[in-house]
Regions:
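Short His-Asn-centered micro-motif
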Residues: 1, 32-35, 91-93, 116-118, ...
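N-terminal anchoring/stem segment of glycosyltransferases
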Residues: 1-64, 79-84, 168, 259-269
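A structural signal for well-ordered alpha-helical segments within the folded catalytic domains
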Residues: 9-12, 16, 67-71, 189-193, ...
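A conserved donor-nucleotide-binding helix/loop in the catalytic core
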Residues: 56-89, 99, 103, 115-116
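Extracellular structured ligand-interaction cores
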Residues: 85-92, 155-160
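Conserved donor-nucleotide/metal-binding helix-loop-beta segment in metal-dependent transferases, i.e.
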Residues: 96-135
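Catalytic core and acceptor-binding pocket of nucleotide-sugar-dependent glycosyltransferases
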Residues: 142-234
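Long, low-complexity C-terminal extensions of enzymes
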Residues: 222-269
């Protein structure tokens, strides 16, 4: 959503690199949730549009725009005609695939959810101290349950989330917890933290980091977005099969020289 073309280009590149590994007989459907459906009209995907009203409601009138991810996931699951055996893999737009992502679906089980990465225990990482400062020793009532921060609470990166239909209620529970956190914990990571804490009440969690590549940091984005834009400008008119093939040849990873150059330029600013 939004006006940043880099997000739309990233979604296109992500789906093209994903499709390289999907055979015609694989029961995989790619779904895009977007404010601008026209951006994806030439791609073999199912598109669900987001209205301005939905965006405002989901972001609490702009108060916390990361809430859109939770509400968007819930919305897609409600719109799709899912069976109890279906597996849903949500991906951010700054992901791409140079190895098969299909093993990720094997990691998603009725008793196990998938996240991108376990970033560590809240009590073991200094950068998560804000959660201890504002939640330690407190109880939060959500429906008929009580939430408390524990020594086992961890931060999980939600660049990728894999769940099954039986886990759908956990999205709503996480959303209620998140709305409490919005007013009590001054951290932008409350969206993934609330979802992980919600899911871990009933399910195991595993990470899928080794199956996906990404460019989520600011300097990686600075390097990757122009490369992806150039690729799409050159190839977007080609048949989809050709785009899929050529996308695998695009090099996003920065060279050591590029990393050093960016660091020097950053220091000089």
């Amino acid at each position: 959503f939004g006006e940043n073309k880099g997000y739309y280009d990233g979604a296109k590149f992500s789906l093209l690199t994903f499709m390289n590994w999907v055979l015609n007989e694989d029961p995989v459907e790619i779904v895009i949730l977007t404010e601008n459906p026209d951006e994806f009209e030439s791609y073999p995907v199912t598109v669900f549009p987001i209205s301005a009203q939905q965006r405002n409601e989901w972001s609490l009138d702009g108060k916390y725009h990361f809430r859109i991810k939770n509400r968007g996931m819930a919305y897609i699951m409600d719109q799709l005609e899912l069976t109890e055996q279906d597996k849903i893999l949500f991906l951010d737009t700054d992901t791409y695939f140079h190895k098969s992502p299909l093993p990720l679906f094997d990691l998603i089980q009725p008793n196990q959810a998938l996240f991108y990465l376990n970033e560590g225990l809240i009590y073991n990482r200094k950068r998560f101290q804000v959660y201890i400062d504002h939640l330690e020793g407190k109880t939060i009532q959500i429906d008929n349950d009580v939430y408390e921060l524990s020594k086992e609470s961890s931060m999980w990166g939600s660049l990728m989330v894999g769940i099954m239909p039986n886990m759908r209620p956990s999205l709503d529970w996480a959303d209620k917890l998140m709305q409490v956190f919005i007013d009590t914990v001054p951290a932008h990571t409350i969206e993934p933290f609330s979802l992980a804490e919600s899911l871990l009440r009933k399910y195991k969690m595993t990470e899928g980091k080794k199956y996906v590549s990404l460019y989520s940091t600011s300097r990686k984005k600075e390097h990757a977005i122009p490369i992806i834009a150039e690729f799409l400008n050159k190839c977007q008119a080609l048949p989809i099969d050709k785009q899929i093939s050529l996308a695998q040849k695009v090099i996003i990873k920065r060279s050591a020289f590029k990393v050093i150059k960016q660091r020097i330029l950053h220091l000089l600013r």
